[in-house]
Amino acid sequence: MILPAGMDSGQSLAAEMRSAFSENGLLAGSSDFEYRPEQQEMAEAVGRSLERESYLVVEAGTGVGKSLAYLLPAVHYGLESGRKAVFSTHTINLQEQLLRKDLPLVRKLAGRPFRAALLKGRGNYVCPARLKQARMNSGDLFSSSESDELEAIWKWFETTQDGTLSDMDFQPTPKVWQMVCSEAEICS
C-alpha cells in the first residue's frame, strides 16, 4: 500500500480514493486541498476504472480538481501493479502544472518514489539541422525582421537546456518557427 495511515489496504482502489478525497481524508492535510464532491466522485470513478481495466470518459468543469482526481489513483495503481501511466494534455501549460505542482503533491502523498517525465510533441523542439539551413538561406526565406528573429533563435539555441519552444524568453512568429522546428522527415 502506498497511501499512508488511514487507508485500509484491504479496500478497493475506488474506496481508497473515496476516503482520500473525503473532507477528512488523506488530502485534507494539504494546504491547497478544498473538499469537492465532484473531485471525490471522479477520483473514485478513475480508481474503479483502473481496477476493472476499463475505459472511462470524464467531463468536469473548471475548478473541480480533475488533475489530482486522475493523478492520485493512477499513480497509486501504477506503483501497486508495476504498470506505467501516460497523461496526455491539450496544452503544454497543463503538462507543466502537472509536473511542477500536482505530481510533487502526489509524490509526497504516495510515500514512495516514482518517475515522471514531460514529453512534448516534435513541433515544440528546434531542429539543429533546419536551424542551420534556415540561417544559410535567411536572405531568400525571410524579411529583415524575420532574419533578426532567426538570429535571436540561434543565440537562444546556443544556450538552451532542452531546445523547446517553451524554454524561449520570446515567442517566435509561426513562419520563422515552422522553418526551424523539428520534423520527422528531417530531424532525428
Model regions and ranges:
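Alpha-helix initiation/capping motif
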Residues: 36, 65-67, 127, 164
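Conserved pre-motif I regulatory segment
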Residues: 6-58
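Walker A/P-loop
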Residues: 51-73
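Walker A/P-loop NTP-binding motif
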Residues: 47-48, 68-81, 101-105
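A substrate-engagement module of RecA-like helicase motors
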Residues: 2-29, 82-188
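Short, surface-exposed connector motifs at secondary-structure boundaries
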Residues: 52-56, 80-86
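Alpha-helix capping and helix-loop boundary segments enriched in small/acidic/polar residues
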Residues: 33-37, 58-65, 90-94
